[in-house]
Design a protein with these regions (language model features):
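Extreme N-terminal leader/targeting segments of oxidoreductases
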Residues: 1-33, 51
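N-terminal Rossmann-like FAD-binding beta1-loop-alpha1 element of flavoenzymes
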Residues: 29-58
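Glycine-rich FAD pyrophosphate-binding loop
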Residues: 51-71
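Glycine-rich active-site loop/strand segments that organize a redox cofactor
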Residues: 72-101
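A non-catalytic, amphipathic alpha-helix used as a structural packing/dimerization or gating element
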Residues: 94, 98-112, 142
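Flavin-dependent oxidoreductases
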Residues: 213-287
Length: 287
């Protein structure tokens, strides 16, 4: 197992609201719930459990937000990575509706957490899926019709021609499906804000604490290099970084890499000239 690592250089790290200085875990502790992973999943779980009276210890192998939570594209978008029709064909109408509702609930929860805990993460409403080819334009039309008819989702607008050009200064896109309910934020600052909220709520947060082994029994024992945590419940929230901790889960993990580039600062005037409403934009080419 690799040793702890600092945050990689990135735009998000360079513009973070603060640097973290949580202690490294050592000794022996006991709690109701131990959370492995200091990203959005782990921190949100820890925060909500602590609010309900559980004693929670969170262990992060590197630093808070080190993984995907702190260096993703920052877009918070409705739905999933494929059309709901594909999900419906796999799980059926009823479960597809539940999954759809869950995706909308996650958007609302993000906004609620930002509001309740005054998280400074540059949340901005608005996101657009862009079509480059005529076939993609038709896909966006069908997508909008499906979500309106089957899920009563009426936040979408389909833009073309001059209307589209007035929103984004490029001739590359043929159409854009705009969602006023989605948005974008600074992912690392959002994650750090969740850590602040969790700590204030009473969660014990430790960084640079690699978990070496998990032993199951009447109580679960989480073994680190400098101590162990005994808990009644364990949450594995390490995403693709759970190698060696749970063989059962590891067999089902497929790490996927995405890549993000940042320009030099454009200045507010130039940025607004390019995207007039400051929405997030993503084309629908398959990656």
């Amino acid at each position: 197992m690799v040793d702890s690592q600092p945050h990689p250089d990135s735009y998000y790290f360079a513009s973070a609201n603060r640097q973290t200085d949580y202690p490294e875990f050592s000794g022996t502790e006991s709690c109701d719930v131990c959370v492995i992973g200091g990203g959005v999943t782990g921190l949100s779980s820890a925060l909500h459990l602590s609010e309900r009276g559980y004693r929670v210890i969170l262990l992060e192998g590197n630093q808070i937000g080190w993984g995907a939570s702190g260096r993703n594209g920052g877009q918070r978008i409705f739905g999933y990575s494929c059309e709901m029709s594909k999900i419906r064909s796999l799980v059926g109408v009823d479960d597809a509706k539940k999954l759809w509702d869950l995706s909308l609930e996650s958007l609302e929860l993000t906004r609620q957490l930002i509001h309740d805990h005054q998280i400074q993460c540059d949340w901005t409403d608005g996101q657009m899926h862009a079509a480059i080819k005529p076939r993609q334009h038709r896909e966006l039309e069908l997508w909008r019709a499906e979500l309106s008819a089957d899920y009563q989702y009426d936040h979408l607008e389909l833009w073309t021609g001059n209307e589209l050009k007035s929103k984004i200064n490029t001739d590359r896109y043929l159409a854009g499906l705009y969602d006023s309910n989605s948005g974008h934020l600074h992912p690392l600052n959002y994650t750090l804000g969740l850590a602040d909220a969790a700590e204030k709520q009473g969660v014990f947060i430790y960084e640079k604490t690699m978990v070496r082994e998990v032993r199951e029994g009447s109580r679960i024992k989480v073994i680190t290099s400098k101590g162990d945590v005994s808990c009644s419940y364990l949450i594995l929230a390490g995403n693709a970084y759970l190698s060696g901790i749970s063989g059962q889960i590891h067999k089902k993990l497929m790490p996927v890499g995405t890549y993000i580039g940042a320009t030099d600062p454009l200045g507010k005037e130039k940025a607004r000239e390019l995207i007039t409403n400051n929405m997030a934009v993503a084309d629908i080419n398959f990656v």
